[in-house]
Amino acid sequence: MLLDAQRFFNRSFSINVICELKHNVNTRRKFEIKDWPTIMLVSRNDKPKISSEEVTHFIDDYKKRRKTQMTRFFGITIFTLITCRIAMKKMITAKVPLNTFQANYASRTQTITHTQKSLAGSLLAATGMTLGIFGMGITGTCWSWDVSSFQELKQRLERRANNEFVVTNMPLDKRSQQVVDSLVKTHNSSLCK
C-alpha cells in the first residue's frame, strides 16, 4: 500500500512523504488524506522500509518540481514584461516634425493599411499583455500551492471547496513519526555536504 502523508518540517515548508508499506504483495492502493485514520489502523504492524537513497531521490524530485514551477512563473513574467514594453512603445504618440507655417493641430495623413497595421499590432500587444497577467496569476498560485498538473490543481480546489482540514499539524503514530524523522535527518545531512 502507498501512504501519502503531508507534514511540515524544517523551516516550515511542506513535503509529501511517500513510503511503501508492504501489507499484502497482491494489494496496492493509494490512500487519500481523508483515509488517514484507516491507514493508521491498517499499518500498525507494518514497518516502513525507506532507504536513505529513496529519501534522497524523493528530495531531488521535490527540488526539480519546485524549480519547474518557478521556471514557469518567471518565464510567463518575462513574456508579460516584453509585451508590456511593446504596448508602451505602441502607445507613445508619433511625433510629427512641423513646418514653419503648419498649425499645431494638423494631424499627419496616414494610409488605411498603416492604420490597420497599427490597430492589429495594438490588439496583439494588448492580448499578449492580458494573457501574460492571467498566466502570472495562475502560475504564481500553482507555485505557492505546490501544484504541477491539472489533476493536482483539481484536487487542491476540491479540498478548498469542501473545506477539508489538512492533517499536517495532527499527531502522527510512532511508525509515521519514524519516517518523518528519517526524512528530516537525511535532508539535514544533505544540506551539510
Swiss-Prot record:
Membrane topology classification: Single-pass membrane protein
Keyword annotations from UniProtKB, A to Z: Membrane, Mitochondrion, Transmembrane, Transmembrane helix
Species for this entry: Saccharomyces cerevisiae (strain ATCC 204508 / S288c)
Other notes: Present with 623 molecules/cell in log phase SD medium.
Transmembrane segments: 119-143
GO cellular component, one term: mitochondrion
InterPro entries per record: AIM11 (IPR038814)
PANTHER family, per the entry: ALTERED INHERITANCE OF MITOCHONDRIA PROTEIN 11
Subcellular location: Mitochondrion membrane
Name by which UniProt lists this protein: Uncharacterized protein YBL059W
